[in-house]
Amino acid sequence: MQYWGKIIGVAVALLMGGGFWGVVLGLLIGHMFDKARSRKMAWFANQRERQALFFATTFEVMGHLTKSKGRVTEADIHIASQLMDRMNLHGASRTAAQNAFRVGKSDNYPLREKMRQFRSVCFGRFDLIRMFLEIQIQAAFADGSLHPNERAVLYVIAEELGISRAQFDQFLRMMQGGAQFGGGYQQQSGGGNWQQAQRGPTLEDACNVLGVKPTDDATTIKRAYRKLMSEHHPDKLVAKGLPPEMMEMAKQKAQEIQQAYELIKQQKGFK
């Protein structure tokens, strides 16, 4: 009920013997309270809707990526289950993720339409869009190889989310570098295949994670580090619309960034 503020304001004015102008003042104060409460309730409703859409779209697009290679195998389903495990999805949340994954596997899944809808609810929040794309890239590389059809789907996703080809290619390099810190996958030289990371991280890997060059100065590297940490701060992302279930992945990404930065500082000798 959006009138409680006005009712209480008028009641308090009458009890205090405020007369006509006291009632008017109580009514105005109550009106301001009702408006503030209404805006807050609308924000929470929009926030829940944004988180629900982010969650559903994430797993729908995962399903679409998997189906783009052809028939969905048991291995593909196992990989999807592993990603759900990483997000600590259980019970109703896991069932919802599985249902969304199946929706994405349909032959007529409207990818471009879904991406436009997703972009519109993000309201230009690039950190949310970036997190979504990073999750999809991880899903595409999870089986150890990047199928040409998966790459084509990723390009469509990036295009509809307003990410240029150059930005997307940089994301790929950042994910490749991050694989050395997060136990993921790395790309084989000269090809599109990715394999389980076996070597330790190098300065080049760390710089790729931060999107900088080994020759960049300390100021440039620190600026890139702070920007990435701000964009991947789990609490900030959840406040902007990231589903709480995906906070763990945001934490893991932030840890990769932190580890990469520490290695760069050690290798280049700055604090």
From Swiss-Prot:
- Which residues point to the Periplasmic side? 1-6
Keywords carried by this UniProt record: Cell inner membrane, Cell membrane, Chaperone, Membrane, Transmembrane, Transmembrane helix
Q: What do the Gene Ontology cellular component annotations say?
A: plasma membrane
Concerning Pfam families, the annotation shows: DnaJ (PF00226), TerB (PF05099)
Provide the transmembrane region boundaries.
Answer: 7-31
Q: Does the keyword Transport apply?
A: no
State where the protein is found. Cell inner membrane
Q: Which InterPro entries match?
A: DjlA, DjlA_DnaK_co-chaperone, DjlA_N, DnaJ_domain, J_dom_sf, TerB-like
Keyword Chaperone belongs to the record: yes
Q: Which residues lie on this side of the membrane: Cytoplasmic?
A: 32-271
The primary site where this protein sits is membrane
A molecular function GO annotation: protein-folding chaperone binding
Record-linked Gene3D superfamilies: DnaJ domain, TerB-like
Question: What positions does the domain J occupy?
Answer: 205-271
Identify its membrane topology class: Single-pass type III membrane protein
What's in the domain note?
A: The transmembrane domain is a dimerization domain.
Reported function = Regulatory DnaK co-chaperone. Direct interaction between DnaK and DjlA is needed for the induction of the wcaABCDE operon, involved in the synthesis of a colanic acid polysaccharide capsule, possibly through activation of the RcsB/RcsC phosphotransfer signaling pathway. The colanic acid capsule may help the bacterium survive conditions outside the host.
Q: How does it assemble?
A: Homodimer.
Which NCBIfam families does the entry mention? Answer: PRK09430.1
Record HAMAP family: DjlA
- What name has this protein been given in UniProt? Co-chaperone protein DjlA
Organism field: Escherichia coli O157:H7
Q: Which gene encodes it?
A: djlA
